[in-house]
Structure formats: structure tokens, C-alpha cells
Design a protein with these regions (language model features):
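Short acidic-glycine-tyrosine-enriched beta hairpin
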Residues: 107-124
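N-terminal leader/capping segments at the start of a protein or of a new domain
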Residues: 1-50
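Glycine- and acidic-residue-biased ligand/ion/polar-headgroup-sensing regions
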Residues: 90-107
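Double-stranded beta-helix
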Residues: 8, 13, 18-21, 131-154
């Protein structure tokens, strides 16, 4: 089971001093990825040291309608167009390509991405596919957004 990357979370200790409360590697707990952190509300409630990335999660939805999600997704070249294929969301997603190469598909074209590339996905129809011989990995922050076009399919 893949567990990369390392996750560091800070918080407060019993004396009210800042401290590292989590230093671990999360197991893959999503189809093709793992949660780093999830907040059910916005603004986030930082009053607890509870591990908001540990699950189990109440549903398979990768984002909370009123909060935010931070996840890592893994793409294998042999998987083809990932997940639900072309899909839309009711989120705005901030994406960093961490390793490998990916194709980012829209209804009218394809852009090839490499490590360090940044994507702002505004929820319109899109899809992902790893290219080359090596797996790819992205870090994604998902925030709720008003739908654009036809709205969410996932």
C-alpha cells in the first residue's frame, strides 16, 4: 500500500504552545489517492487536535459541501482517463503536479503537465491521464464553489 508523501500537522499542546501533533504518512484511502486533511466548515474549526485526515469518511465524496479538502492523487499510465473520466465538480481546485507527467483534458483540448505545473480547475468538464512510463502524483486543495455550466457530475 502506497503511503507517500509525509504529512506534518501542527497544533497546540496542553500548555497552549505550538507543537507538531502529526508526523506520518497516510495510507491510500481513496480510489487513487489519500486525504491529507478535511474541514467540514469554512472557516475551518482549528480548536481540536483531532486528525481530520484519518477517516473513515461518511461518504465517498472527495469534498465537503461547506468545507475544504486537501488530498493527494496518484495516476498510473495504464489506468487511462482517470476516475469518472470527463467530469464536473462544484468545487474550485488548486492543483500542484508533484511527480510524473499528466494530460489535463478539457472538452476542446489537452494540455500536458510536468512536475511543478499548477492548475486552477474551476469545476468545468475535465479529466486526467498519466503519460509516459512512470506514475504521476498531484496535491489538490478543493474548496466549495458555485457551479459553472451544468454543475457537478461527481
Amino acid at each position: 500500500m502506497q503511503t507517500f508523501p509525509r504529512r506534518i500537522v501542527n497544533g497546540l499542546n496542553a500548555e497552549g504552545k505550538s507543537t507538531i501533533i502529526i508526523d506520518d504518512c497516510r495510507p491510500v484511502d481513496l480510489p487513487g489517492g489519500q486525504f491529507v486533511w478535511r474541514c467540514k466548515t469554512s472557516p475551518a474549526d482549528n480548536s481540536s487536535n483531532e486528525d481530520a485526515g484519518a477517516g473513515p469518511f461518511e461518504n465517498s465524496c472527495i469534498h465537503d459541501r461547506d468545507g475544504s479538502s486537501f488530498a493527494v492523487f496518484h495516476f498510473k499510465p495504464e489506468d487511462g482517463l482517470m476516475g469518472p473520466g470527463m467530469h464536473t465538480t462544484d468545487t474550485i481546485d488548486y492543483i500542484v503536479v508533484l511527480k510524473g507527467r499528466l494530460e489535463f483534458h478539457s472538452e476542446t483540448g489537452v494540455v500536458e503537465l510536468k512536475p511543478g505545473d499548477l492548475v486552477v480547475d474551476r469545476g468545468v468538464s475535465h479529466g486526467w491521464r498519466a503519460v509516459g512510463d512512470e506514475p504521476a502524483m498531484t496535491a489538490v486543495v478543493m474548496l466549495p464553489a458555485h457551479p459553472v455550466g451544468s454543475g457537478a457530475t461527481i
